[in-house]
């Protein structure tokens, strides 16, 4: 009699993911919801597990007070890998009822979205300004995205991918390359570092925070 469960069947919206997954606290952000039964949603052209997804743009006001920054409230469970991220829980309202909850995390830097133009080759790299949070999509499967930015000698950056810790079934990898030009204007590319994963567990066996998300401390050796 103690082993009970609840089965709910409804026409309410279902959100699969949000782009970007983070925004700056204290600001109003534009977000695109991807899912099914989204009121006013349009075809996204994407398919997830054989099912077409809709998309819908929404405006969300992210709280910026100190209390909100230190609180990760909501009804959905938070695993050890996500426990280090602050944010809010969001539900899309509709006449059929509110959607499932999704988390939108706080970013300390401006959020830059992936361009719609192709950026899956080095020659098509998207130019960004750092520091920033770059929000992209691994779509289609085995997608590659290239970005480029200017760096000065002596600058130090933390380059970090957050995907596995968002609950996505991914195994990210990134490469840092330096692009220089000779007197003729010809580009030369050299690899600085390839990073596959950073399996750091700060919680021990009782609170395992291990993730396959890669990170790298990039100390800029030369202007580039």
State what each model feature region is.
Residues 1, 83-95, 104:
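Short, aromatic- and glycine-rich surface loops/edge beta-strands on solvent-exposed regions
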Residues 1-4, 8-73, 81-83, 130-224:
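Acidic, Ser/Thr/Pro-rich low-complexity intrinsically disordered segments
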Residues 93-131, 180:
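Predominantly extracellular/luminal regions of secreted and cell-surface proteins
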